[in-house]
């Protein structure tokens, strides 16, 4: 009898070597024997008990068996030449309760017959504990029948019959396994030959019955990656030296191992971080070192109600001998884009892809070919697997996919791998055609977007960049930047080719026709609901602008800073703008030189009411020199304006024009109706008219003009113009009218004492009425229209030669009624019409009226009456 003796000590004392195995078990034993006088044991009975310990393969730590308790009882009967050993072994929840018999037939020298059967009528002989997965339920074998032959002379062990089965009231839980084989020690190396066949059984049962020492790495991979379903057929055969089946043994020859397994309804998870393939039909073929798993069909349920179909799958380990063994898999995926979007949003792909698509807002179908490479190892390192997915998307659409906009495509190509992904093709972004190339590399937080598109007026409105009539035409753009769920602060780099478009005061005073080269580059950043354009650079058509600008979610300007603001060659300006807490935009412009010609012209011609929103504004301009038309300049311009609620609250302007003549403006109240007006005055009206290119042939003149301020409603602006002591030079028609006056010969121009006219300004137009010009040699009446949009003047009236004498009759009430044309028209006059551009109108006269008295002339139509497009101003 012995108690708690280490098997290690027993083996060491007996000088026995178990090779690579280390047995660490505390052993207790008791033996009772009857010995014949000849010293031959007649009866031997006893018990061997092993308490908790381990049996470990020193060369491969994965082959490890924990023994909780083992109890062997034995009884040798020499007369019957029979050894009976009932035993029970408990290991990790598994339990083996059987009875082994060993008989030595007298007629067969050196032969022992081994039989293993059920050892207890109540306890199942083999009970296998559940696996780590919830799908791997435990299993019990209730029938065991093993017959084996040990031939010591031939050094051979043969399993003639090995039947393990379970008969259950549930047909799906019935199973049976048949084993035959031999182990031959006669040669230089032990040689094993075996065959295993199984009936239909659950996959979980096969996994639980798989011995821990057989194909350890493959067993570990199957344990983690395959579950559920049924094994329809299993046949395993081997015939090779025993060393070939060891973990560290030589490669298995091609005819040394054959495995044939067919399953249905199986769940396969090739990569642990991706959803499993369910309802799969698998066929496993292993020949020698080559293992191939074919998948006929299956589905991937990425989220409730969203599935992808899997077909044509192949999982192959070309050589199972290297450790770890390298495997590859390929299969085809078909399904809806919403399911694919849910897959991309899964934990295994979200960080790799970097872009999350809402499955609820995506549409289309996807067909993809997937290739996977992995190392069969346990534990599986994070970098032990890689994949490549080539996908074709059709009828694709996804809301807010790029730049917060909807993306649509009839076809789209996508390539994804464990190193990153790429999406490339022709799409529509919020309805705008574009070409995209979207890429993301492993380890990067966001994807990089390369996009080309042509943005027309409709597209700009859809993108919330409605520029009105300031930009007409389509703009080719190139966009490079980072997009994704973790968008960094790098922003989007945009390059816009402005050559094909017409620009009209996109920036104050910048006018560019179609075809003249210009480009803009900037970096667009979205911060919350605001959009900021940094590193803004505009070049072309004389413009050079550098700075930054920011807009809020309503496309309202928040701030702007342009340290370089040159809209024409030679401009030297800076501009800053910011919106205060009261919502008013504060704009400050400073500089030495500014070419104001385009600004003046476009301001007069503006008709875009949508662009003319009268927002709250504080304007502060200080410019050394403002260049105008016809060589005239404003110098020392200092202008301050404040507007609230669409109404101008304060206005003040000081400057000099001509030969240092002041040109000033402010707000005043008109006495007759107590109405606020904008008031300008200067002693050089001619210089101002030349500066604005309204009429370059006027010289001198003390002028004041009063007009209604602009309003939020774009109401017509009524005003009055008054000029005294001025001259008109270089006007041939006027000089012909006065050529007959005494002393008129050789004069350089025509002098006038005063001019007064009422006008009404509309967007892009002006209507003149009740205009009267008086002078010593000639007078005139003026009425008509000026269309700045079409650059067209259409004025008409009457020249009255010798105004002072000729109009004398008109001032006499009775005589003037019959002979005169009224208190402001002469007895004799010449009707005229001025048409053409404002800066150079063409004046024509009607000589017939020169000989007719005023009463008769009223029945002779002026030239303008015959113009079907002429619309007299409203009086």
Question: Where are the regions that the model predicts?
Answer:
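A short, well-structured beta->alpha microelement
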Residues: 539-541
């Amino acid at each position: 009898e012995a108690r708690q003796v280490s098997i290690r000590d027993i083996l060491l004392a007996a000088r026995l070597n178990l090779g690579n195995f280390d047995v660490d078990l505390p052993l207790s034993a008791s033996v009772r024997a009857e010995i014949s006088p000849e010293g031959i044991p007649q009866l031997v009975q006893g018990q061997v008990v092993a308490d908790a310990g381990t049996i470990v393969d020193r060369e491969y730590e994965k082959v490890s068996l924990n023994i909780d308790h083992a109890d062997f009882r034995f009884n040798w009967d020499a007369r019957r030449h029979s050894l009976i050993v009932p035993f029970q072994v408990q290991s990790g929840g598994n339990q083996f309760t059987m009875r082994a018999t060993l008989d030595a037939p007298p007629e067969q020298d050196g032969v022992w017959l081994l039989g293993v059967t059920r050892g207890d009528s109540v306890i199942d002989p083999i009970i296998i504990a559940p696996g780590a997965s919830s799908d791997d339920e435990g299993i019990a074998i209730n029938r065991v029948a093993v017959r084996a032959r040990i031939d010591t002379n031939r050094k051979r062990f043969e399993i003639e019959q090995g039947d393990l089965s379970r008969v259950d009231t549930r047909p799906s839980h019935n199973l049976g396994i048949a084993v035959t084989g031999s182990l031959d020690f006669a040669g230089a190396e032990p040689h094993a030959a075996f065959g295993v066949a199984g009936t239909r059984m659950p996959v979980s049962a096969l996994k639980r019955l798989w011995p821990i020492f057989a194909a350890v790495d493959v067993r570990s991979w199957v344990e983690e990656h395959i579950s559920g379903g049924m094994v329809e057929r299993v046949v395993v055969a081997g015939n090779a030296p025993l060393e070939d089946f060891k973990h560290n043994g030589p490669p298995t020859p091609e005819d040394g191992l054959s495995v044939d397994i067919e399953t249905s309804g199986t769940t396969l998870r090739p990569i642990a971080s991706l959803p499993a393939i369910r309802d799969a039909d698998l066929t496993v073929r292993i020949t020698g070192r080559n293992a191939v798993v074919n998948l006929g069909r299956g589905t991937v349920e990425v989220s409730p109600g969203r599935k992808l179909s899997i077909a044509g799958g192949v999982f192959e380990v070309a050589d199972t001998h290297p450790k770890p063994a390298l495997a590859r898999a390929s299969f085809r995926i078909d399904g809806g884009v919403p399911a694919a979007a849910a897959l991309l949003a899964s934990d295994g792909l979200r960080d790799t892809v970097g872009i999350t698509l809402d499955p609820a807002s995506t549409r289309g179908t996807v067909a993809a070919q997937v290739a996977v490479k992995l190392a069969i190892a346990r534990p599986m390192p994070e970098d032990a697997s890689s994949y490549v997915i080539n996908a074709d998307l059709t009828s694709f659409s996804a809301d807010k996919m790029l730049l917060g906009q909807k993306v649509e495509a009839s076809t789209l190509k996508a390539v994804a791998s464990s190193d990153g992904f790429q999406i490339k093709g022709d799409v529509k972004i919020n309805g705008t055609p574009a070409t995209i190339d979207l890429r993301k590399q492993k380890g990067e937080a966001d994807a990089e977007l390369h996009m080309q598109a042509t943005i027309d007026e409709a597209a700009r409105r859809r993108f919330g960049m409605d520029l009105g009539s300031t930009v007409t035409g389509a703009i080719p753009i190139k966009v490079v930047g980072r997009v994704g769920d973790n968008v960094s602060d790098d922003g989007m780099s945009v390059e816009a080719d402005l050559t094909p478009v017409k620009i009209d005061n996109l920036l104050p005073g910048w006018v560019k026709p179609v075809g003249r080269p210009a480009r803009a580059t900037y970096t667009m950043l979205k911060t919350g609901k605001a959009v900021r354009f940094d590193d803004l650079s505009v070049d072309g058509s004389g413009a050079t602008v550098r700075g930054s600008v920011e807009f809020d979610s309503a496309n309202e300007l928040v701030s702007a800073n342009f340290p370089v603001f040159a809209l024409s060659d030679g401009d030297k300006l800076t501009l800053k703008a910011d919106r205060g807490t009261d919502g008013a935009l504060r704009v400050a412009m400073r500089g030495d030189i500014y070419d104001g010609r385009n600004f003046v012209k476009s301001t007069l011609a503006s008709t875009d009411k949508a662009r003319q929103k009268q927002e709250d504004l504080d304007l502060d301009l200080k410019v050394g020199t403002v260049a105008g038309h016809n060589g005239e300049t404003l110098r020392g311009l200092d202008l301050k304006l404040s507007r609230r609620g669409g109404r101008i609250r304060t206005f003040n302007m000081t400057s000099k024009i001509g030969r240092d003549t002041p040109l000033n403006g402010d707000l005043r109240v008109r006495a007759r109706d107590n109405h606020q007006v904008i008031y300008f005055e200067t002693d050089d009206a001619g210089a101002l008219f030349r500066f604005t290119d309204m009429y370059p042939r006027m010289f001198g003149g003390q002028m004041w003009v009063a007009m209604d301020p602009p309003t939020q409603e774009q109401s017509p602006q009524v005003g009055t113009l008054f000029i005294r002591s001025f001259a008109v030079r270089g006007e041939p028609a006027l000089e012909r009218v006065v050529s007959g006056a005494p002393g008129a010969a050789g004069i350089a121009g025509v002098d006038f004492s005063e001019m007064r006219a009422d006008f009404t300004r509309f967007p892009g137009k002006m209507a003149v009425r009740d205009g009267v010009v008086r002078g010593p040699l000639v007078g005139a009446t003026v009425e008509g229209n000026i269309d700045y949009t079409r650059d067209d003047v259409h004025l008409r009236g009457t020249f009255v030669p010798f105004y002072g004498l000729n109009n004398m009759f008109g001032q006499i009430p009775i005589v003037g009624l019959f002979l005169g044309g009224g208190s402001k028209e002469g007895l004799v006059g010449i009707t005229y019409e001025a048409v053409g551009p404002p800066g150079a109108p063409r004046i024509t006269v009607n000589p017939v009226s020169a000989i007719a008295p005023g009463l008769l002339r009223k029945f002779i139509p002026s030239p303008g009456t015959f113009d079907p497009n002429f619309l007299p101003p409203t009086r």
